[in-house]
């Protein structure tokens, strides 16, 4: 399997979502974060778009989102986030296990995702992810194996203040199992808002002087 080609194609799809301005319906706004959705073309579910402002430069924000080491210290939606295969300095495969949601009505899922960071002109960075088959990590009876259709983060500088970033996140997750779509549609917008808030808190915590290894981890 040509993982690098898949990664590059996924980044291109995320860039396309970012340029697509038609058909989005706002489903939640909270604390200056906006969640919109439209029908996914990949599966019978929604593609979500989440927008917020992060008080950090795009370069530092994208490094923060790309690194694996500290992810579960701030991302409260995950219980496991491990790199399982490094392809090159910009591309790796990770195994994640989510927490349960909706007071336990959505049980934990696990995912095997191909993650890729691509840097564009104008200080815009895209971190894309897409589920792949990876024989070393077959589905387990302990968790339902979910599937992420092309997802990602787009980090770009704010025109009026380049030290701040506009973060746009795209999510289209196929939970699988026996969930009704209505449960997912009710819980997903709040979970996405919480992710942005958790990321803001995580970045704040990383601004303390004890940042040794921060950049090293993103390329280890």
UniProtKB/Swiss-Prot annotation:
Indicate yes or no for the key word Transport. Answer: yes
Q: Where is the START domain?
A: 1-208
Q: Enumerate the Gene Ontology biological process terms.
A: lipid transport
InterPro entries assigned:
StARD5/6, START-like_dom_sf, START_lipid-bd_dom
Pfam families attached to this UniProt entry: START
Keyword tags = Lipid transport, Lipid-binding, Transport
Supply one GO molecular-function term.
lipid binding
* PANTHER family assigned to the protein according to its UniProt record, in alphabetical order: PROTEIN CBG07384, STAR-RELATED LIPID TRANSFER PROTEIN 6
Functional description taken from the UniProt entry = May be involved in the intracellular transport of sterols or other lipids. May bind cholesterol or other sterols.
- Protein name according to UniProt: StAR-related lipid transfer protein 6
């Amino acid at each position: 399997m040509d993982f690098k080609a898949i990664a590059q194609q996924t980044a291109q799809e995320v860039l396309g979502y970012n340029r697509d301005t038609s058909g989005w319906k706002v489903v939640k706004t909270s604390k200056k974060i906006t969640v919109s959705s439209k029908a996914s073309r990949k599966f019978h579910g929604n593609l979500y778009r989440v927008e917020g402002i992060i008080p950090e430069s795009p370069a530092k924000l994208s490094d923060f989102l790309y690194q694996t080491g500290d992810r579960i210290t701030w991302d409260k939606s995950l219980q496991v986030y491990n790199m399982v295969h490094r392809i090159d300095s910009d591309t790796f495969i990770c195994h994640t296990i989510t927490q349960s949601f909706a007071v336990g009505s959505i049980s934990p899922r696990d995912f095997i995702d191909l993650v890729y960071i691509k840097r564009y002109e104008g200080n815009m960075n895209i971190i894309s992810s897409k589920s792949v088959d990876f024989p070393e990590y077959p589905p387990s009876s302990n968790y339902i194996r979910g599937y992420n259709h092309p997802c990602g983060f787009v980090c770009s500088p704010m025109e009026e203040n380049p030290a701040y970033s506009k973060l746009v996140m795209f999510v289209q997750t196929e939970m699988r199992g026996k969930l009704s779509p209505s449960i997912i549609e009710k819980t997903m917008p709040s979970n996405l808002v919480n992710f942005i808030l958790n990321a803001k808190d995580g970045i704040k915590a990383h601004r303390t002087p004890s940042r040794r290894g921060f950049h090293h981890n993103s390329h280890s």
